[in-house]
Amino acid sequence: MAAAAGDRASSSGFPGAAAASPEAGGGGGALQGSGAPAAGAGLLRETGSAGRERADWRRQQLRKVRSVELDQLPEQPLFLTASPPCPSTSPSPEPADAAAGASGFQPAAGPPPPGAASRCGSHSAELAAARDSGARSPAGAEPPSAAAPSGREMENKETLKGLHKMDDRPEERMIREKLKATCMPAWKHEWLERRNRRGPVVVKPIPIKGDGSEMSNLAAELQGEGQAGSAAPAPKGRRSPSPGSSPSGRSGKPESPGVRRKRVSPVPFQSGRITPPRRAPSPDGFSPYSPEETSRRVNKVMRARLYLLQQIGPNSFLIGGDSPDNKYRVFIGPQNCSCGRGTFCIHLLFVMLRVFQLEPSDPMLWRKTLKNFEVESLFQKYHSRRSSRIKAPSRNTIQKFVSRMSNCHTLSSSSTSTSSSENSIKDEEEQMCPICLLGMLDEESLTVCEDGCRNKLHHHCMSIWAEECRRNREPLICPLCRSKWRSHDFYSHELSSPVDSPTSLRGVQQPSSPQQPVAGSQRRNQESNFNLTHYGTQQIPPAYKDLAEPWIQAFGMELVGCLFSRNWNVREMALRRLSHDVSGALLLANGESTGTSGGGSGGSLSAGAASGSSQPSISGDVVEAFCSVLSIVCADPVYKVYVAALKTLRAMLVYTPCHSLAERIKLQRLLRPVVDTILVKCADANSRTSQLSISTLLELCKGQAGELAVGREILKAGSIGVGGVDYVLSCILGNQAESNNWQELLGRLCLIDRLLLEISAEFYPHIVSTDVSQAEPVEIRYKKLLSLLAFALQSIDNSHSMVGKLSRRIYLSSARMVTTVPPLFSKLVTMLSASGSSHFARMRRRLMAIADEVEIAEVIQLGSEDTLDGQQDSSQALAPPRYPESSSLEHTAHVEKTGKGLKATRLSASSEDISDRLAGVSVGLPSSATTEQPKPTVQTKGRPHSQCLNSSPLSPPQLMFPAISAPCSSAPSVPAGSVTDASKHRPRAFVPCKIPSASPQTQRKFSLQFQRTCSENRDSEKLSPVFTQSRPPPSSNIHRAKASRPVPGSTSKLGDASKNSMTLDLNSASQCDDSFGSGSNSGSAVIPSEETAFTPAEDKCRLDVNPELNSSIEDLLEASMPSSDTTVTFKSEVAVLSPEKAESDDTYKDDVNHNQKCKEKMEAEEEEALAIAMAMSASQDALPIVPQLQVENGEDIIIIQQDTPETLPGHTKANEPYREDTEWLKGQQIGLGAFSSCYQAQDVGTGTLMAVKQVTYVRNTSSEQEEVVEALREEIRMMSHLNHPNIIRMLGATCEKSNYNLFIEWMAGASVAHLLSKYGAFKESVVINYTEQLLRGLSYLHENQIIHRDVKGANLLIDSTGQRLRIADFGAAARLASKGTGAGEFQGQLLGTIAFMAPEVLRGQQYGRSCDVWSVGCAIIEMACAKPPWNAEKHSNHLALIFKIASATTAPSIPSHLSPGLRDVALRCLELQPQDRPPSRELLKHPVFRTTW
């Protein structure tokens, strides 16, 4: 490097430099031993001899360098001493050395900028070398040390003299102009950066070795830190061709800047005095955070998912986030943001760092305000960069793009190091997404503007931009060149990578498969309803690539990609779209195939197995792909997505025909994975999800009678369904879940538990009423039951506690249900014995205890081992169909008598003995020798439902309800002896309560009462009698912890869980006998009925008696009854779009009725007020008639006069002339517009006073004239059809010569604006009167699909009485294309007075009727304070006012003296969001207009 310096120095013409170069080259960059002393000696001699000549030369050189090179000031280094090894080390003090040494103090006047070495030849290079060698000489070298201070002082003085002479030189003007774009000198910038990063600098003398190795090491280190690795000898002093190389040498050793700053201290001060800028830079500029926090914030901004949506003002941007609702306005200059998070928020830093591309160390980044020239400079650079990308790309750019597309992973490492600065900058720009302002990597999903600038963008960023365009109702355009995007489908130009699919989106969207025209066409037709394009293309995980291929073929890449989105909203929308597409495809396929195949197998899913047409094949493939999708999406953890998946499942099933057995088999096979997924969801931790899953499968069990009936929505489908209960049972039992997969087991067990309760007729035929037809033999039904119990028996020993306990509970509760069929009960005991379970002994004890309860223990012990089939007849005989009014004791006696001929006298045994024995069984007391057991639980709280299953038949429910003998008068009598026996005793387990027991009659009364309470929609006569041996209620919520008390009102919901099913009344008895009977909760409760509910206070007194039993009862209650109003069913969540849950709480109903009445009353009052307003609107004064302006029906309202040229066809020819100054006279001017004038006029023939609006239609070009004529005709014809008391009326219109004359009725009171200027602000009563009339007129216009768009005081006319207001001047009015309020066809048109215009109009967004409502609020402000809103009279610059309103975050200030009512009206009108403003018709219902002022 030093050799190169020597060569370059010798070419400059200095002999000393040429003489020094050989030593420099031979030394290889290392100083010789005597180099430093020799340089110091030469420096001392030259200082005394040739000072004046050198000073003159320095001044000339300084002028030259500064005048030419100060444009490099932002890149100039802090100190020049960071050069590489000094090239000049001559052993003898030659004149060249001396000259170099004397000039070594040149930096005292100011450091040469980078590039000075190349322009000044070797002299400046040796200056630095000699200066370094002299400055760093050892302490022992006295002559150089003594000479150094004197030389510096001399240089300082002479430099100052030269600087004073530069003040009036023309170079100074150039320097100032060069400094306009700079804000802070680079030395100060670097100094601040180093100070923040390294803290205070401690200056220490650095001893330099005699051989100069310290300086060599320093230079080498500096060189190593540089970004450009070229072989230049002085990276700090050369002029680099790359802009990135100038800051590369600004970092050196931590201690070196301190030393140099001390020795060359005049540098910053002198440089500051050389070129004082004409405009000082903005103040501050220091980061308010610590260096670490500053770095963290900058890094956060560089990674933030923010997007530049558009520039919405001269100095403002609209910044968006991933969510379409997150938009923020960033204002440059004031440096603030609409997010309200204070200065230097992430959005402002995003604009500064990524939009303006400032360096993180740029002081402008941390300024709280920027001056105008700084803002202009930033925007100028931004727009120049942006416009450079819009220009047509060069051939080289296109070739590079093509090469990158074809070979993305073969980037050469050397290709980035050999490019010029301009090409590198442009290449960097091309590799940056213009929306997120981040680089585009090869592995990212990219798209390209194909019809415009051909710039690449991120797919995700483009989807954000597409959503913005969609919300603004704009066509999708390129955010750079504004050219129209080819399609709403974003074509994937992503480069091939292991993650991406090789098939592009465009290829997928083409109808390459026979399924595409069916599903794809439906999807495209309904794109407006279920538009997914604005979500962009979502990446499909690699694990699902192969699985998703048939999905893509059937439904398209766009929809399938959204199913894998990380945003649950996108997934939900995709499922809604999928539901729509599939139902449409199935309808289309079914409709076309039924005509060809004749119905038998037409439209089937068997892919042509039953029919040879292609249409069934299409629908079959769609269903197959659809079921595959559902098997995955039904596992979604988000509840709303899961609901959407079930809705999609229903949509598919109800439109899928199934006529043959083959079709049923195929449909069963396709649905099997879906059902398996839902089975797992039955044990979901989310209670709503588990309830909904169980309810869904119950609907499937109902077959063609349920909500999931196959082909339900197809007319005359005649589908046979998928099999109902049998199919669900096959799904439960078919795939035997592994024992380690506890979720699958628990989900199946939860469903089994619910099935046995909800559709008990399928499993317990002995308790079904005789009038219920039995489709299947009893044997088959019992086999179903046994298969389920065998499945539960397999899981009794499961390691997962919840699985094992629920299995045991199901088994025991089913055993209790079949006690009336002793052979079946015996079969259960046998199955338990054969299982070899570790719980065998305990389970058998509990089974025998159940047998003892119902007095069939002897039957079991006598060896009733007959097979189930052999005992069916006796089983039927043992189970009478119904016992509507028999007590539990009587029924037990009946079973005993008819079953095995047991003695009826057995009933006379002491009830105390039975109660004591079975209470111990039920409670599981430690003192009970027969029922000793731990405290297992099915729920997480650790309490088993099974502990409640074995309640004593005689354990009195009266324990909880002591006063229930009176209410029930319809209960039949029972034997007195039974009553006496039961009433004498109480179970030993409940002695501390001291509450007398209840009689069986009382028990039965309570049971019947409770039955009426719980059975909302059931016919109690069809239900079985109240069994004392009862199974527990369902446990769909078995997996989650419950509240410690029953929820008030929960009993009234009991029937909901078992609606439309053969729910046994023993369910009620299980609550009565087991839950309340076994000494459970409270001794002070009342009978549950429709008017009463359980409260925590009622069961509190029994809590400490037996917490085990209390907990079990509580679990039974909560498992059997919905604990609150949030019960989730398939019908409430899926089948009905807007579910209305039946409420049985009378208090709630009363509240609802009361509120409903209040609401109805208020609505009636509003409607009455509106009727009055409309009635007042109907009162219309007579309009004077001018004969010459009348036209026949069907003729054009515009009458063309005779002397008018025939250039305007379509008008009515005048039968009678009506010319100015002849038939009518023009009076004083009352208004003036750009192309129109308004005058008072009088009809000569009738004397009618009129106002005439004369509009000239002549323009410079014919096309412009045609537009004007068409607009005038539209205005005239519009006004001719308007007839309302608050709308100005037109008498007629003529076309005469070059003018259109619009004759309108005369309003003598002039305009509201004129009255305000003449009389001042109105009183509030007047404001309310005028506002109401204004709203009436606007309501009439809006109902006729007209928006005025120019509502202001100048266009509101008052009649001669001052009481009637009419809306005038429809020059800006336009007719809406539809009757929808949100029509937005007038985007970008700035019509009307600015101060009264809505922000969305000024922003160029879509607008509709709501813009007139905003103007009403502005008119209220104008009438209340006689000034337009926004202090518009103080704004002489219309653009500034537009910007103020368009960027406003609050409504204009409302006068404080307004009453609350009128203030509320104004605030409603001035809602910033158009959709939040009420329609004018709704505002008329406001109470302020119903009050007499």
From Swiss-Prot:
Active site residues according to the UniProt entry: D1350
UniProt biased composition (Basic and acidic residues): 152-171
Phosphoserine, modified sites: S21, S137, S265, S282, S287, S290, S497, S521, S910, S999, S1024
Tissue-wise expression: Most highly expressed in spleen, kidney and lung.
Biased composition (Polar residues): 496-506, 925-940, 998-1014, 1049-1060
Mutagenesis or variant effect for D1350N: Loss of kinase activity and of autophosphorylation activity
Position of the signal peptide: none
Compositional bias (Low complexity): 1-23, 33-42, 95-108, 135-151, 230-257, 507-522
Main location: membrane
Residues of the Protein kinase domain: 1224-1489
Documented EC number(s): 2.7.11.25
Covalent S-S links between cysteines: none
Residues bound to ATP: I1230, G1231, L1232, G1233, A1234, F1235, S1236, S1237, C1238, K1253
Compositional bias per record (Pro residues), positions renumbered to this chain: 84-94
Record's protein name: Mitogen-activated protein kinase kinase kinase 1
Species in which this protein is naturally found: Rattus norvegicus (Rat)
